[in-house]
């Protein structure tokens, strides 16, 4: 799963206003048998997404025709709580989400999103409700704004995560940015 740079991003939204959506609800443990990051998308929100007979649940917002192709998930508070499985971020990315806007995130889940090229954004309830009522919204990561029509909202993000996402860098690429310093240190401290 390559990490694509995120600078300005416009996408279709889907609301899923549940609080405390945990990683087992995002990707049930029964589907954690893969050894790669891909292939988890069909199992994202498995217990909500499908009816007992395996057909799509028509009441689950992401299954509704008006939300088809949504790449921005707008959700409640404490998103990604529960176990620290990175599979939850993999499943959401593989499903097609690039941006998740919530009232709050589990710290580990937030980090797993950024490690996998997804931008997690924290906004208040009124802002999320307004954005969820729009068909498309635009995120400007360098300026840290989310906008739709005539309204714009600021969000906070650590400069390290921002740098990573704007430049499409994974952990190895970040380390390689310091290759000269690492080499200097190793040469200086040869035993």
Swiss-Prot record:
Keywords from the named record: Amino-acid biosynthesis, Branched-chain amino acid biosynthesis, Leucine biosynthesis, Lyase
Pathway the protein takes part in: Amino-acid biosynthesis; L-leucine biosynthesis; L-leucine from 3-methyl-2-oxobutanoate: step 2/4
GO biological process, one term: L-leucine biosynthetic process
Reactions mediated catalytically: (2R,3S)-3-isopropylmalate = (2S)-2-isopropylmalate
GO cellular component: 3-isopropylmalate dehydratase complex
InterPro entries: 3-IsopropMal_deHydase_ssu, Aconitase/3IPM_dehydase_swvl, AconitaseA/IPMdHydase_ssu_swvl, IPMI_Swivel, LeuD
Purpose of the protein: Catalyzes the isomerization between 2-isopropylmalate and 3-isopropylmalate, via the formation of 2-isopropylmaleate.
HAMAP family per the UniProt record, alphabetical: LeuD_type1
Subunit-level organization: Heterodimer of LeuC and LeuD.
Protein family according to the UniProt entry: Belongs to the LeuD family. LeuD type 1 subfamily.
Protein name as catalogued: 3-isopropylmalate dehydratase small subunit
Source organism per UniProt: Staphylococcus haemolyticus (strain JCSC1435)
Underlying gene: leuD
């Amino acid at each position: 799963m390559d990490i694509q740079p995120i600078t300005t991003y416009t996408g279709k939204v889907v609301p899923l206003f549940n609080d405390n959506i945990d990683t087992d609800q995002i990707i049930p443990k029964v589907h954690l048998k893969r050894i790669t990051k891909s292939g988890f998308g069909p199992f994202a929100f498995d217990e909500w997404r499908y009816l007992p007979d395996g057909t799509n649940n028509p009441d689950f917002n992401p299954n509704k025709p008006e939300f088809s192709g949504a790449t921005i998930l707008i959700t409640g508070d404490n998103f990604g709580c529960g176990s620290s499985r990175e599979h939850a971020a993999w499943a959401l990315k593989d499903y097609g989400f690039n941006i998740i806007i919530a009232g709050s995130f589990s710290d580990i889940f937030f980090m797993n999103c950024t490690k996998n090229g997804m931008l997690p954004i924290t906004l208040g309830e009124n802002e999320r409700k307004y954005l969820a009522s729009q068909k498309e919204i635009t995120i400007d990561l360098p300026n840290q704004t989310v906008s739709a029509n005539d309204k714009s909202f600021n969000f906070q993000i650590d400069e390290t995560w921002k740098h990573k996402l704007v430049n499409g860098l994974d952990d190895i690429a970040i380390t390689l940015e310091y290759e000269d310093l690492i080499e200097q240190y190793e040469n200086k401290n040869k035993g």
